[in-house]
């Protein structure tokens, strides 16, 4: 169980600033909204009630990690100090909490909803919310609001709402998406232009928001597993690995070495699968049609391996609490061992037709630069963070599975541009092959599934687990009250920090560069919208 320190709201901002400056807690790993219910006279004195937030922080300097929480009992006007001036990603994280719980973050510059319609009534993640009564099915188009609210604290302690315009009347604003192919899903960017130069981007999320975190509260633990595959569908195995690992950690379950080997190999096959699709999609975005076919051709070999063992190609449904759904197919080892030399032998062709292409290089080199400091402040993990010089690989920071038993290099570049983000992923394909090669002939015997009770109840407490997904750190925060269903199950989306940073990355770039920048950030919209 994770120990979480409580801080009263009045002292929150000063304490967070102290942790950032003195303890070097520069990485806001996760920010989770909570509804601990209404206070009752029967409650024990230590029972936490009210609406609040759980923060997970980490120092990229010392590696120290800490979790904090705060709460307010006023449900009519819950107010908590904003930390968006300390960590840039808090801007989007706090908007998400406001959207779900109605908590107003004092000092936040843009207190709009993040996922739901602007005319949505109520806050759906509150335990006492009834959305069907307040929100009948609406078939009308949503009105676009250009007004934001900045919540300020007056010297006398009162709150002041200051309305601000997103765009000026003279600004030329273009919509990129939500139906534009280069947005890689239903994501809408409202782009302010001066000629061809980008001056500002307003990212609009939520077009395929499905309320997965709300659904989890009415599902048993085994039932929640299926929904993780529907988040980042190019990292389905890794997502479910994180959730299973979190539940197993909470229940004190130690899976067999065979399961650890299988999960690690599957995670790395998934990483290669995702990076090959990244290569193809980026090539198509930049007009390199031949390169597009290379990635899809070779990705099929991995999907065939998945289908044979898991029964699915994209959505595998393979990991389960205590192990995996079925043992490896008899052909699994043979087919994986055939794929390794094949991929190694052909990767040079990928570089010949695209990496070394002068047009591709001119579209990516020096374009969309993200500094290391901004990567950390926005929480841009994965290939994006490592391309900016931040060694943030969860497999190295907090080893899980059998990553502590294999030799592999964490790929880090320092340029922070589109080309560096591209090269990180291409190099990671080779490192994933190296990891798989060390494991494939050494899979130990043993059970592929631990015996579980028919009804799974997780001990009361708070738990966090994370894996290195194809796009970065995918985290799971679980709060249990000892029931067969989670009290709160929150996912740290890998893609939300990437979209949060896109305004900073693109300012001053040309509109055509937005395509290359979005392609190399490699976000997946269902992972963001959840």
Curated annotation (Swiss-Prot):
In the N-terminal section; belongs to the complex I 30 kDa subunit family. Its main location: membrane. It catalyses: a quinone + NADH + 5 H(+)(in) = a quinol + NAD(+) + 4 H(+)(out). Gene3D superfamilies: Cytochrome-c3 Hydrogenase, chain B (1.10.645.10), NADH:ubiquinone oxidoreductase, 30kDa subunit (3.30.460.80). It is a peripheral membrane protein. Residues 1-144 are annotated as: NADH dehydrogenase I subunit C. It is an enzyme of class 7 (translocase). NDH-1 shuttles electrons from NADH, via FMN and iron-sulfur (Fe-S) centers, to quinones in the respiratory chain. The immediate electron acceptor for the enzyme in this species is believed to be a menaquinone. Couples the redox reaction to proton translocation (for every two electrons transferred, four hydrogen ions are translocated across the cytoplasmic membrane), and thus conserves the redox energy in a proton gradient. Signal peptide: none annotated. One of its GO terms (molecular function) is quinone binding. The keyword rRNA-binding does not apply. GO terms for cellular component: NADH dehydrogenase complex; plasma membrane. Its EC number is 7.1.1.-. NDH-1 is composed of 13 different subunits. Subunits NuoB, CD, E, F, and G constitute the peripheral sector of the complex. Keywords: Cell inner membrane, Cell membrane, Membrane, Multifunctional enzyme, NAD, Quinone, Translocase, Transport. It holds the Pfam family Complex1_49kDa. It is found in: Cell inner membrane. It comes from the Bacteria. Residues 171-530 are annotated as: NADH dehydrogenase I subunit D. This is NADH-quinone oxidoreductase subunit C/D.
């Amino acid at each position: 169980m994770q120990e979480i320190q409580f801080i009263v709201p009045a002292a929150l901002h000063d304490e967070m600033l102290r942790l950032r400056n003195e303890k070097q807690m520069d990485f806001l790993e996760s920010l989770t909204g909570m509804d601990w219910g209404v206070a009752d006279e029967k409650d024990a004195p230590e029972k936490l009630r009210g609406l609040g937030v759980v923060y997970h922080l980490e120092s990229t300097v010392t590696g120290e990690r800490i979790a904090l929480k705060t709460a307010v009992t006023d449900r009519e006007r819950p107010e908590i100090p904003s930390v968006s001036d300390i960590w840039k990603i808090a801007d989007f994280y706090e908007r998400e909490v406001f959207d779900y719980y109605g908590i107003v973050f004092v000092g936040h510059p843009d207190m709009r909803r993040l996922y739901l319609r602007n005319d949505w009534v109520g806050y759906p993640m509150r335990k006492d919310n009834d959305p069907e009564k307040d929100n009948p099915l609406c078939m009308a188009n949503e009105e676009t609001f250009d007004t934001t609210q900045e919540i300020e604290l007056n010297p006398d302690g009162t709150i002041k709402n200051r309305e601000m315009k997103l765009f000026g009347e003279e600004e030329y604003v273009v919509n990129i998406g939500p139906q534009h192919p280069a947005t890689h899903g239903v994501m809408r960017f409202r782009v302010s232009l001066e000629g061809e130069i980008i001056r500002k981007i307003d990212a609009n999320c939520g077009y395929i928001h499905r309320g997965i975190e709300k659904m989890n509260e009415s599902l048993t633990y085994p039932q929640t597993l299926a929904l993780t595959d529907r988040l980042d569908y190019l990292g389905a195995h890794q997502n479910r690995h994180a959730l299973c690992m979190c539940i197993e950690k909470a229940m004190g379950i130690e899976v067999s070495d065979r399961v650890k080997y299988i999960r690690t190999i599957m995670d790395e096959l998934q990483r290669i699968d995702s990076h090959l699709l990244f290569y193809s999609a980026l090539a198509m975005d930049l007009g390199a049609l031949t390169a597009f076919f290379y990635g899809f051709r070779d990705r099929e070999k991995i999907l065939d391996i998945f289908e044979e063992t898991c029964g699915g190609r994209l959505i595998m449904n393979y990991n389960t609490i205590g192990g995996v759904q079925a043992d490896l197919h008899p052909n699994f080892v043979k087919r994986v061992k055939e794929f390794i030399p094949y991929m190694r032998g052909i990767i040079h062709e990928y570089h010949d037709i695209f990496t070394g292409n002068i047009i591709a290089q001119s579209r990516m080199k020096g374009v969309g630069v993200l500094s290391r400091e901004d990567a950390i402040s926005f929480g841009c993990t994965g290939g994006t963070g490592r391309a900016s010089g931040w060694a943030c690989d969860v497999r190295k920071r907090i080893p899980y599975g059998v990553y502590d038993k294999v030799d592999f290099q964490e790929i880090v570049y320092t340029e922070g541009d589109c080309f560096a983000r591209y090269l990180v992923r291409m190099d990671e394909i080779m490192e994933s092959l190296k990891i798989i090669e060390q494991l494939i002939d050494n899979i130990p015997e043993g059970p592929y599934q631990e015996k579980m009770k028919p009804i799974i109840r997780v001990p009361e407490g708070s738990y966090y687990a994370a894996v290195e997904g194809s796009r970065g750190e995918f985290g799971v925060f679980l709060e249990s009250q000892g029931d067969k269903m989670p009290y709160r199950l929150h996912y740290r989306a890998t893609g939300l920090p990437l979209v949060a940073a896109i305004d900073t990355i693109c300012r001053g770039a040309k509109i055509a560069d937005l395509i290359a920048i979005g392609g190399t950030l490699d976000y997946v919209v269902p992972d963001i919208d959840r």
